[in-house]
């Protein structure tokens, strides 16, 4: 009745202003738009009574999954136009559904429109806003909504705080998240296990396992019972830190408290034990897992396969793979990639290709890691052309080569002496928008130096120094070695001496390379001084360092210095390498040394 009265009034008003609107052409257009809009609104007013509420409520009841932006906007407009207005429960349900599709900014726009239409928020819609701001990494705005929550007289609940904590971790604000938990307690809002699990997970991801353990003890003090997720997260973090004993201790504590372990807990422990070389303990734990009727999953087997492959135990890996199939567990891309990498590392390329065929037959699509492993395998046996054929087929499968793929092939060409092809591939990499990293540049510079293109290497190195790329000691060592081999020992020495000013600390390899350069130049006294400086700087010489100096002194005819260095080398647990032994034998045969020197060397 009210709507009809409103329409009658509006019609009278329209008749009164009609003569004025028709005076100009532009206003005639406005009139047509106005009339059209007017009757559309009338139609909507009537339709909303009969169909509107039924329509959107039916949509909400049936569930909104993967709704597109335009459809969401249309549905929201329908809700806003409906009379009577939908309840805040309906709006909350709608906003939550849109948020689940990760259209967070759209939800925030809807919330703003809700306010503009004079519809007040409740704690549920405000919590949804906080969640959306947090998921967009805008916790500062989320805090402003929290202020609104309090201003409206609502009490922030654990959902509010849990959401804020997750948002802080998304932005890497670990300390702020921990402080927020304490603030919750101070404000009389008791954090629940979900709150603590969010904090523990975030802290462990940031690498601060000790802080996670402290938080576990705080949970006990505050009478919040930790669950399997809490313990499993910390156990996994301890295993990744190499603290296996502490992880086992926490595992036993968990069992004592009656918290049943999950397959995730066992997976972490098995991985940790195997990586620490405790094979028997890992096997026993696996048996314990099965005896407790906790079924190993594909991750369990992948963990064990990875360890076997990295240890070079490919036979054991194959047996484990067969066991996996027997148990009815389907291999995934990680399983196949791990085994393929193992075959390639042992130059068993035929078996690697068979595994590739098998994964395709089993409807498991190879990824870039799969083909990169195969390319690496070909390059390792100097079959870089075959590796290149695999590389050219990658794009046909809809895959894009990454920096690792290109780097492996560039290295393959460099090691095969095909430096021109290496340079061409490097240029192709850049032209295809794949940014070379430090590893790629290091490989290229090393290849250029080894293939007599020092000047080209220095040109690239100079450009890199001007860039913002963190070159690292490996890159500098490569160039210093290239300079020394190319007869630019003075330049190498100047670069070596400038390293501290660049904030780069020389390592054992850097010192050894520089000592070798000084020896080739005949500057043995400087090489000896650098040996002692190396020790003072906390870099203990290795077998390569000693053998380099021993051979230099032998060439110089200083047998006394050579003998002293041999004794020092042996006392450090090192022995002569093949080059040193050959030199001594040659000098022995030519009469420059007696047999006692060879005895001392062995």
UniProtKB/Swiss-Prot annotation:
Ranges for the PPR repeats: 87-121, 122-156, 157-191, 192-226, 227-261, 262-296, 297-331, 332-366, 367-401, 402-436, 437-471, 472-506, 507-541, 542-576
Assigned keywords, A-Z: Mitochondrion, Repeat, Transit peptide
Feature: transit peptide: 1-95
Keyword Membrane on entry: no
Family matches, as Pfam families: PPR_1, PPR_2
GO BP annotations listed: mitochondrial mRNA 5'-end processing; mitochondrial mRNA modification
Gene Ontology terms: cellular component: mitochondrion
Subcellular location field: Mitochondrion
Family matches, as Gene3D superfamilies: Tetratricopeptide repeat domain
Family, per entry: Belongs to the PPR family. P subfamily.
Protein's UniProt name: Putative pentatricopeptide repeat-containing protein At1g12700, mitochondrial
Species of the source: Arabidopsis thaliana (Mouse-ear cress)
């Amino acid at each position: 009745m009210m709507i009809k009265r409103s329409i009658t009034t509006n019609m009278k008003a329209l008749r009164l202003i009609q003569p004025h609107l028709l005076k100009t052409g532009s206003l005639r257009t406005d009139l047509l738009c106005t009339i059209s809009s007017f009757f559309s609104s009338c139609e909507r007013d009537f339709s909303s009574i009969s169909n509107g509420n039924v329509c959107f409520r039916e949509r909400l009841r049936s569930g909104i999954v993967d709704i597109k932006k335009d459809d969401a906007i249309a549905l929201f407009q329908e809700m806003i136009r409906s009379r009577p207005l939908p309840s805040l429960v309906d709006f909350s349900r709608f906003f939550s559904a849109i948020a689940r599709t990760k259209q967070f900014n759209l939800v925030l726009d809807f919330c703003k429109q809700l306010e503009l239409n004079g519809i007040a928020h409740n704690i549920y819609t405000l919590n949804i806003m906080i969640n959306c701001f947090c998921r967009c990494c805008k916790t500062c705005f989320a805090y402003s909504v929290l202020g609104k929550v309090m201003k409206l007289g609502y009490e922030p609940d654990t959902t509010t705080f849990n959401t804020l904590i997750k948002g802080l971790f998304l932005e890497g604000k670990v300390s702020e998240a921990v402080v927020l938990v304490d603030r919750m307690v101070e404000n009389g809002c008791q954090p629940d296990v979900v709150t603590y699990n969010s904090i523990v997970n975030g802290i462990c991801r940031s690498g601060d396992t000790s802080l996670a353990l402290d938080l576990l003890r705080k949970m006990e003090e505050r009478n919040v019972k930790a669950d399997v997720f809490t313990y499993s997260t910390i156990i996994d973090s301890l295993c990744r830190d190499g603290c296996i004993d502490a992880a086992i201790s926490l595992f036993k504590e968990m069992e004592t408290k009656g918290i049943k372990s999950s397959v995730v807990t066992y997976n972490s422990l098995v991985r940790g034990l195997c990586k620490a070389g405790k094979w028997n303990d890992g096997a026993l734990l696996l048996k314990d897992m099965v005896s407790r009727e906790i079924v190993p999953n594909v991750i369990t087997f992948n963990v064990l396969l990875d360890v076997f492959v990295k240890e070079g135990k490919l036979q054991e890996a194959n047996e484990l793979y067969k066991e996996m199939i027997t148990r009815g567990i389907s291999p995934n891309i990680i399983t196949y990639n791990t085994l393929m990498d193992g075959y390639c590392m042992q130059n068993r390329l035929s078996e690697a290709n068979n595994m590739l065929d098998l994964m395709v037959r089993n409807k498991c699509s190879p990824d870039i890691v799969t083909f990169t492993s195969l390319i690496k395998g070909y390059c390792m046996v100097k079959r870089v052309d075959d590796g290149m054929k695999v590389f050219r087929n990658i794009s046909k499968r809809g895959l894009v080569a990454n920096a690792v793929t290109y780097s492996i092939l560039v290295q393959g060409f460099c090691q095969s002496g095909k430096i021109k092809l290496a340079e061409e591939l490097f240029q192709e990499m850049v032209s295809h928008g794949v940014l070379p990293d430090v590893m790629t540049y290091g490989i290229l510079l090393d290849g250029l130096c080894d293939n007599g293109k020092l000047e080209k290497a220095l040109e690239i190195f100079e450009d890199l120094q001007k860039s913002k790329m963190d070159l690292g000691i490996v890159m500098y060592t490569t160039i210093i070695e290239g300079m020394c081999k190319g007869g630019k020992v003075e330049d190498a020495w100047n670069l070596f001496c400038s390293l501290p000013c660049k904030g780069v600390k020389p390592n054992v390899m850097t010192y050894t390379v520089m000592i070798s350069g000084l020896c080739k130049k005949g500057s043995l006294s400087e090489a000896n001084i650098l040996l002692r400086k190396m020790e003072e700087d906390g870099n203990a010489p290795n077998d390569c360092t000693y053998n380099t100096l021993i051979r230099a002194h032998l060439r110089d005819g200083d047998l006394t210095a050579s003998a002293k260095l041999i004794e020092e080398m042996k006392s450090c647990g090192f022995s002569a390498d093949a080059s040193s032994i050959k030199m001594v034998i040659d000098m022995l045969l030519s009469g420059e040394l007696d047999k006692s020197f060879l005895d001392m060397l062995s």
